[in-house]
Amino acid sequence: MDFDFDPEKARLNPINHDGVTFEEASAVLLDPYALTRIDADTTDESRYITLGMGGASRILVVVWTERIERIRIISAWKANQPQRRIYEAQF
């Protein structure tokens, strides 16, 4: 799986979202227990929201889209308590 992202968004994301990097976020999309849903709030492209385990062993939320055989990460942040409960309820 190939990942892509806007370099400026990648630079700002850790500053705005508790140190979460797009590199860490990419691990969420490889998590076999990740939960994904369609982001119904966007109309210009198909976007997805995935809840899963990141590369630093913390549960993250990742917004992403598919673009020409690549996964483009748009944003990522630490899951809040209700989101963590949803993810952990699988086990």
Question: Which residues are covered by each model-predicted region?
Answer:
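Ribonuclease/tRNase effector modules and their secretory precursors
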Residues: M1-F91
